[in-house]
Structure formats: structure tokens, C-alpha cells
Swiss-Prot record:
Transcription regulator involved in mid-term, stationary-phase viability under nitrogen starvation. Might control expression of the salvage pathways or in some other way repress the recycling of nucleobases to nucleic acids and enhance their use as general nitrogen sources during nitrogen-limited growth. Signal peptide: none annotated. One of its GO terms (biological process) is DNA-templated transcription. Residues 158-181 bind DNA. The lineage of its organism: Bacteria, Pseudomonadati, Pseudomonadota, Gammaproteobacteria, Enterobacterales. It comes from Escherichia coli (strain K12). GO terms for cellular component: cytosol. Keywords: 4Fe-4S, Activator, Cytoplasm, DNA-binding, Iron, Iron-sulfur, Metal-binding, Repressor, Transcription, Transcription regulation. It holds the Pfam family cNMP_binding. This is Regulatory protein YeiL. Residues 111-131 are annotated as: Dimer interface. Its main location: cytoplasm. It is found in: Cytoplasm. The gene is yeiL. Its activity might be modulated by a sensory iron-sulfur cluster, by reversible dithiol-disulfide formation, or by both mechanisms. It is not an oxygen-responsive regulator. It comes from the Bacteria.
């Protein structure tokens, strides 16, 4: 806890009730449709947010990277339908019991202020992502997406979900993936695609982010 900024998010000392959780890659930090019992603070690792749509399709919504809260919307709104949060890689989270701390945290001005800043940053990042989807070619967006979602240099997202997230056709996605293989950026394997040239992929991704504001998400 001393190595993170977690304790600085609250006016009250929450050390006694803070727990440490460890999640392996592909473990679920939050199960869809189940109210989380804990307010998580991701201190290390990356995770993805999923939602099941009315037609039964599973849609990839967003990515999280440490440090950030997970479950803060459910803390504020008890009626909010929880979405699935899955670890992309090994994740470590500090956590507070949601039920016990909800009344206290909803009256903690420091926590609420930090939460407002966090949510505004998420909203800004989503706006930037939408703008990038409209303004940059798929080679740049797919490079960033691969770096966001890769697990130990292995990219294995479902093509249907990736195409939907990037707002392109399935065929267009496969065409650019084949181009990356031809250019030596990726190697096709049985489990997915191995990243062969991270530097070149990062260069393509950072063309959309010259100020490196989101480069921490792509470690």
C-alpha cells in the first residue's frame, strides 16, 4: 500500500480494512450482472471491460491500466448493472468492502474529488478514442489496440469483438493483420499473433498520440 497512492485518496485512514487481491490473466475481477462486494484499486496490471448486449453478443467496451479504481460506478449507483472486468495480465488490487464503506466514501470530499477527476479523464480518453476512430487509418488504430490488449507479447482477441471495437469490417481487420504479418510486425501462431516488432507497432500507435498521453496503457 505504501508504494501506491491508494491511501492518499481518502480523508479517513482505511488501512485496517484494506485487502490485497491477486488476479491471474483472464480471471474476472468483476462478474457481469453481480454487484461487486469490493471497491478495487488496480495497483499493477491491465484489464478489459465487457458487456453482453441485448442480442447476446459480447462487446468489448474499454481498457483499464493501473492505477485506477474498479467498481466506483457501482459504489455511487447501487442500481447500476455491473459489467464484466477481466484481467489481461497478472493484476494486483487493493480493495475496501463496498457495503461497509459506501456511506463513508460518499461523504468523503477528497475521495469524491479524485473520483471526479478520474471519471473526467476516462471520459476524455473515450472522446479521443472516438475521434481517432474517425480520423486515423486502421493501421494506426489496430497497432494501438494490439498493444492495449496483448498478453505477454501475444495478441489473441476475437476478430469479431476487435472489429466492432475499432468500427471496421471483419474483412478489413483481417486484411490489416495480414499486412502486419507481411511487414514483420506480427507472427501468426496457433494461439493468436506474436508481436515481433514492438518498436514499429508502438511507432504506428503513437502517431495518434504524439504527446504520449495514453502510452502508459500500452506497456
Amino acid at each position: 500500500m505504501s508504494e501506491s497512492a491508494f491511501k492518499d485518496c481518502f480523508l479517513t485512514d482505511v488501512s485496517a480494512d484494506t485487502r490485497l487481491f491477486h488476479f491471474l490473466a483472464r480471471d474476472y475481477i468483476v462478474q457481469e450482472g453481480q454487484q461487486p462486494s469490493w471497491l478495487f484499486y488496480l495497483t499493477r496490471g491491465r484489464a478489459r471491460l465487457y458487456a453482453t448486449l441485448a442480442n447476446g453478443r459480447v462487446s468489448l467496451i474499454d481498457f483499464f491500466a493501473a492505477p485506477c479504481f474498479i467498481g466506483e460506478i457501482e459504489l455511487i449507483d447501487k442500481d447500476h448493472e455491473p459489467r464484466a472486468v477481466q484481467a489481461i495480465e497478472e493484476c494486483w488490487c487493493l480493495a475496501l468492502p463496498m457495503k461497509h464503506y459506501r456511506p463513508l466514501l460518499l461523504n468523503d470530499t477528497l475521495f469524491l474529488r479524485k473520483l471526479c477527476v478520474t471519471l473526467s479523464h476516462k471520459n476524455y480518453r473515450n472522446i479521443v478514442s472516438l475521434t481517432q476512430n474517425q480520423s486515423f487509418p486502421l493501421v494506426n488504430r489496430l497497432a494501438a489496440f494490439i498493444l492495449l490488449s496483448q498478453e505477454g507479447d501475444l495478441y489473441h482477441e476475437k476478430h469479431t469483438q476487435a472489429a466492432e471495437y475499432l468500427g471496421v469490417s471483419y474483412r478489413h481487420l483481417l486484411y490489416v493483420l495480414a499486412q502486419f504479418i507481411h511487414d514483420g510486425l506480427l507472427i501468426k501462431s496457433k494461439k493468436g499473433y506474436l508481436i515481433k516488432n514492438r518498436k514499429q507497432l508502438s511507432g504506428l500507435a503513437l502517431e495518434m498520440d504524439p504527446e504520449n498521453k495514453f502510452s502508459g496503457m500500452m506497456q
